[in-house]
Amino acid sequence: MTNVTEAPAIARSGTRGSIKVEPMTRSIGALLENVNLGIASRDDALFAEVRALLLKHKVLFLHDQDITRAEHVAFARRFGELEDHPVVGSDPDHPGLVRIYKGPSSRNEQYENAWHCDTTWRECPQFGAVLRCTESPAIGGDMLWANMVEAYERLPDHVKTQIAGLRARHSIEASFGAAMPLEKRLALKDQYPDAEHPVVRTHPDTGEKILFVNAFTTHFTNFHTPQNVRFGQDANPGSALLLNYLVSQAYVPEYQVRFRFRKNSVAIWDNRCTQHYAVQDFWPAVRNLERAGIIGDKPY
């Protein structure tokens, strides 16, 4: 049975109605109806309801959001300041709004696809993002998200004990820079040096524990202890196997939700406790997305 709940909301006309909330899976994601993000960008009560739903479901989906770029940016800024992406430039008229275009002239390459959490190679990774589709392919182009709170909760107890207190290095080289020419890659890394974060971070709003490793994570920085390592050659095999195991938790379908975009669909996600994957299965069709990334805080 579909579990649909309702909360007060404001429709496009400005009259108060109810947000319809339909969970997409038992783990993560909810589809919202009867809410317009242009109105939410200006209405404190409505925005507070959407934000509370985001904390509960971790990623929210909406259809038929015929809003302007200015409204898109204004809504995203209710969560915090926006940041430019180092690889994809912002709209000159709307700083912080990034266009992600794929079409016939785009290279049909898959190297950029990986489960990841945005900008963990920064000292303060993004809080989250508001992504709107302005043109979608007839087939394909879905996105998936994974609940990294549940991924942590379902780890065996002995693994939780092993990773308690572990820290890890995150590098822009591990994904975006992987296919770049050496000089460009080194320049990018010089501009965005590696960051170090706890392997298990705490959600600053909910207090939940989060498994915080992803495709940008290169290695643990404090695995080399007398308990873990007898000799130097123990460090790499032991830590690499553990890191690969932890990174692979995002691949578990029970932790995931999958969303099919159409024109004016919007996804809003909490980057602190999720990972996502954009499926590249639609070339040479066109998919045009616009994303506002929100500056986050330092993981602890």
Feature locations, PLM:
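Non-heme Fe(II) oxygenase catalytic core, chiefly the N-lobe of the double-stranded beta-helix
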Residues: 2-266, 271-300
